[in-house]
Design a protein with these regions (language model features):
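Short, small/acidic-rich helices and loops at N termini and domain boundaries
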Residues: 1-86, 295-296
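Glycine-biased, small-residue-rich flexible motifs in mid-sequence functional cores and linkers
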Residues: 2-4, 77, 84-326
Length: 326
């Protein structure tokens, strides 16, 4: 991990309240780096188009060395890095969207951010069918197509998608259980007893999973996913957020988080969505960003399938197998 002292101005830039991604990126186009913005006086900042007095006050107040040093030390202690939009390691697909984050906080493997990524989204209160479908697609895309699975670490479909990819990596890594019966994440009917005949594969042979948070990396939300978060990192995946440490989960952050899920991905797979589901926000982002939208058909008698089945009626591509994802 690069010395965070070299990135302290990017950390400072992320701590400014009330300054959104679009205005941050506009400032970067004018001044080049956060360090140059940091040097500006209040009078100079007030001359910048689109920056009002309240925002200027927030920029000046964020120049607090004590708070900045606290963040640097906390990040160093907890293996949290920050990558910025001017770095090669910053996801190039995400860089192309209108409101790309100026920086991303990251724990884990940043090498996968520029890989083959597919998002999986759906209901928090998913049915057993949704659970099995999420595991099935994530497991097989990771194992058979070496695709990284992107999701939001929320309850329901998100969690099962992450677990499906983690399961593929655990199975690929294992060389001790060749020929033994194991639970298969790769069967949509959750049929246990599959023989693992792919033992001996290196962990790197499988796609990983990327979790996007709507809060700082100093906490995992929901708490029940702490174990999952640890398994993601342990198995070569990564957890990222545009929000600095100390940012609590807020309902306003999650729709913004969704644009990163789709922005990082070549396309998204929708598994169960109610008629007015928040999942459909991610679909809207994906369409705006020119991403593919794949939809798993659902039970016509289930409220969890109203949104997904409507998407199919509107022309989204229906998928019933991981092999349908091209």
């Amino acid at each position: 991990m690069e010395d965070l002292e070299n990135k302290k101005y990017w950390i400072w830039f992320s701590l400014i309240k009330g300054l959104g991604c679009v205005r941050k990126n506009n400032l970067l186009k004018i001044y080049g780096t956060p360090e140059e913005i940091y040097k500006l006086s209040k009078r100079e900042l007030l001359k910048v188009d689109g920056i009002g007095e309240e925002t200027v006050t927030n920029i000046i107040e964020a120049k607090n060395e004590k708070i900045l040093n606290y963040h640097i030390k906390y990040m160093e202690k907890n293996n949290i890095d920050i990558i910025h939009i001017c770095e090669k390691s910053y996801p190039q697909a995400l860089k192309q969207i209108y409101d790309a984050p100026a920086s991303l906080y990251i724990r884990g493997n940043k090498e996968i951010l520029n890989g083959k990524n597919i998002g999986i989204v759906g209901c928090r209160e998913c049915t057993d069918y949704g659970k099995k479908a999420a595991k099935y697609f994530a497991y097989n895309l990771s194992k058979e197509k070496f695709v990284n699975i992107v999701s939001g670490l929320a309850k329901g479909v998100d969690s099962y998608a992450h677990w499906g990819s983690v399961g593929a990596n655990i199975e690929c890594e294992s060389t001790k259980n060749c020929g033994k019966k194991q639970e298969s994440f790769g069967k949509i009917n959750n049929n246990c007893g599959k023989i693992n005949d792919d033992c001996g594969k290196l962990k790197n042979d499988c796609g990983k999973t990327i979790a996007i948070l709507g809060n700082g990396l100093d906490m995992i939300y929901p708490k029940e996913n702490i174990e999952l978060a640890n398994e993601i990192i342990r198995n070569g995946g990564t957890i990222i957020s545009e929000y600095p440490c100390g940012t609590k989960p807020d309902k306003m952050n999650f729709p913004a988080r969704n644009r990163i899920i789709s922005g990082l991905s070549k396309g998204i797979i929708v598994i169960e969505a109610k008629e007015k589901s928040g999942t459909l926000i991610t679909v809207d982002f994906a369409l705006e960003q020119g991403r593919d939208v794949f939809v798993v058909p659902g039970n016509i008698n289930s409220i969890n399938s109203v949104g997904t089945n409507d998407l199919i009626k509107q022309g989204a591509k229906m998928v019933t197998s991981y092999e349908d994802i091209k």
